[in-house]
Amino acid sequence: MSAAEADRWAWLLVLSFVFGCNVLRILLPSFSFFMSRVLQKDAEQESQMRAEIQGMKQELSTVNMMDEFARYARLERKINKMTDKLKTHVKARTAQLAKIKWVISVAFYILQAALMVSLIWKYYSVPVAVVPSKWITPLDRLVAFPTRVAGGVGITCWILVCNKVVAIVLHPFS
C-alpha cells in the first residue's frame, strides 16, 4: 500500500483511534478497580479484623458488666483499639486506591493526548477526506484547516467530529 493509498484511509484510522480511546475511557473505572484489587491484598486482613471485632462483641454481650467489670472494661478497650486500627487501615487503603485510580487516569489521558498529537502531526497538511466544496461552503476554510485544500476536511475538524459522534454513540454504554 502506497503512501497515497494510506492517506485515503486516514479518516478510518482517525475514527478507529477515537473510538478506541472513548471505549477505553468508558472501561477506565473497571480497569482501575481491577488494578487496585490486584495491587492491594489488604482486604483479607480487614475482613479478618472485622471478624475478630465481631467475635469480641459477641463475647462482650455474654459478660455481665456488674459482676465482671474489669473483664468487661478490658474487652471493651480491646474492641475500641481494634476498631481504631481497622479505621486507620481502611483510610490508608482508600487513599492508596484513590492514588492508583488517579495515576491510571492521568496515564491514559497522557497517552490519548500523545496519540492525538501524533495523528495531527502526521496528517497536518493532508486532508483526511475530500468532499465536494459545495457541501461545506460557508465553513470550508474552517473545516479544511490546516490543509487549505478546497473541499478537504482537516485533521483537527475530523477529530472533533469523530469525538462528538463516538460520544453520542457510546453514551448509552457509559
Curated annotation (Swiss-Prot):
Domain of life per record: Eukaryota
Region of interest called Interaction with GET3/TRC40, as start-end residue ranges on this chain: 39-97
Membrane topology: Multi-pass membrane protein
Primary subcellular site in the record, as a coarse category: endoplasmic reticulum
Residues passing through the membrane, by range: 9-29, 100-120, 149-169
Coiled-coil region list: 39-94
Biological processes per GO annotation: tail-anchored membrane protein insertion into ER membrane
Pfam family, one: CHD5
Keyword list, A-Z: Coiled coil, Endoplasmic reticulum, Membrane, Transmembrane, Transmembrane helix
Protein localization: Endoplasmic reticulum membrane
Gene Ontology molecular-function annotations: protein-membrane adaptor activity
Membrane side Cytoplasmic: residue ranges: 30-99, 170-174
GO cellular component terms, semicolon-separated: endoplasmic reticulum membrane; GET complex
InterPro entries the record matches: Get1, Helix_hairpin_bin_sf
Stretches of the chain found on the membrane's Lumenal side: 1-8, 121-148
The protein's role, per its UniProt record: Required for the post-translational delivery of tail-anchored (TA) proteins to the endoplasmic reticulum. Together with CAMLG/GET2, acts as a membrane receptor for soluble GET3/TRC40, which recognizes and selectively binds the transmembrane domain of TA proteins in the cytosol. Required to ensure correct topology and ER insertion of CAMLG.
Subunit structure: Component of the Golgi to ER traffic (GET) complex, which is composed of GET1/WRB, CAMLG/GET2 and GET3. Within the complex, GET1 and CAMLG form a heterotetramer which is stabilized by phosphatidylinositol binding and which binds to the GET3 homodimer. Interacts with CAMLG (via C-terminus). GET3 shows a higher affinity for CAMLG than for GET1.
Cross-referenced PANTHER family: GUIDED ENTRY OF TAIL-ANCHORED PROTEINS FACTOR 1, TAIL-ANCHORED PROTEIN INSERTION RECEPTOR WRB
Family, per entry: Belongs to the WRB/GET1 family.
Name of the protein in its database record: Guided entry of tail-anchored proteins factor 1
Gene: GET1
